[in-house]
Every structure is written in C-alpha cells, then in structure tokens.
Amino acid sequence: MRLIGMLDSPYVRRVAISLDLLGIAFGHESVSVFSGVKQFSAINPVVKAPTLVCDDGGVLMESSLILQFVEARSGRSLWSSDPAQLQHEFRAVGLALAACEKAAQIVYERQLRPTAAQYEPWVERITGQMLAALKALEYEVGLRPAVFADPGKQAAITSAVVWSFTQAMLGAQLGAADYPSLAALAQRLEQTAPFLKYPSAGPGVPGLGAGQ
C-alpha cells in the first residue's frame, strides 16, 4: 500500500502513525496538494490527502475511512471493544477532528487568501468553533485520563496529532498553559517511536498540506 500526502497534514500523519501501530507495511510518498498538484493528480485526480493506494490499485480517501478499511483488513483495532469506553473515545476523536478542520480553515484563510478578500466574521466563527472543540477536548483529557492513557489507541493518537498541528500553525492564538492536559498528552506521545518516525516537521516535510 502507498500513503500519499505530506506529514504536516494532521490527517496524513494520523494515518501514517496508525498504520505503523497496526503493523501494516506501506510506503509513504510526501506529495503536496499545493506544490505537487500534477504529481498528486496522476495518482488521485481529486488531489486529496491523505490518499491510500491499496494493493489492488484501488484508491481511498478520508482519513477515518482509510483507517476503518485498514483495521478491517488487518483484523486489529486501535479502538476499545467496550461500548462505554468507545463512546468516550469517539467523542474525543470527534472533538479533535472538529478542532483540526476549523484550524485548517483558519490557516487557509490567513495564509492562502489575499488579505483584502478575507472575511472576518467567518474567521471569528471558525475560530470560536475551534476554541470550543479544544476546550471540550481539554476537559475530556483531564476528566478521563484512562481514555488517553494508551498511546496505541486512536483517542490519544488523534488528540496528540491535532494539538501538535494547532500549536505549529496557530500557536500564537493557543497558549499551551490554557490546555495543560492536552499539551501534556501531546508531549508524551510525541516522544513515542511512531510519532518520532512520522514527524509533522523536518526534512521532507515542508509547507502547508492540511488535506483531509
């Protein structure tokens, strides 16, 4: 299998880390949806990251669907089997992905759209949504540490990946002191082998590639 997309995208990164934890062999190709449009479109004309090229040549998109597929294929899961615990994990990942989506929209608005064309009421709205999601996620991490204790579970993985992304792109707006539980979670997971193997920044991880 081939995973296409830049690791500065939290969606690509969560898939890469998850594939590694599931023990699934794959090749990662750092192709940007911005500077590498021609190369990306030759693989997937939709030019959406992450893209997973399956062993039979089939092409999948959307990080959550990709992860659902690879878990079904491998017979392993990064989710709890207990429904009560799973409910909390789903809430955490839902909040993290909501924060991620709004953070990416803010970045696109500020970095890609000409200043004169930026619509402040829209920026205020999505900023409020991002902050609400992060506040709720911070509460969950502090209230239910057991849900995030295992670095091999999706709740911890996605929450940490998203926090690192928001800090890298919008750190001036998001003081770590306001999210101590979330910041501590990310700091802990960023020191684990899968996170170090697939960093969000560094050689070969330039630019802006936050495609879902």
What are the residue ranges of the model-derived segments?
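GST-like domain detector, emphasizing the conserved glutathione-binding G-site
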Residues: M1-E120
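Short polybasic/polar patches that bind polyanions
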Residues: D20, A168, Q191
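Aromatic-glycine hotspot motif
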Residues: L52, S64, M130-E138, P194
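Non-transmembrane alpha-helical segments in soluble domains
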Residues: L67, E71, F90-V93, L134, ...
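GST-like fold's C-terminal all-alpha helical module
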Residues: A96-Q187
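Long hydrophobic alpha-helical segments typical of transmembrane helices together
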Residues: A176-Q212
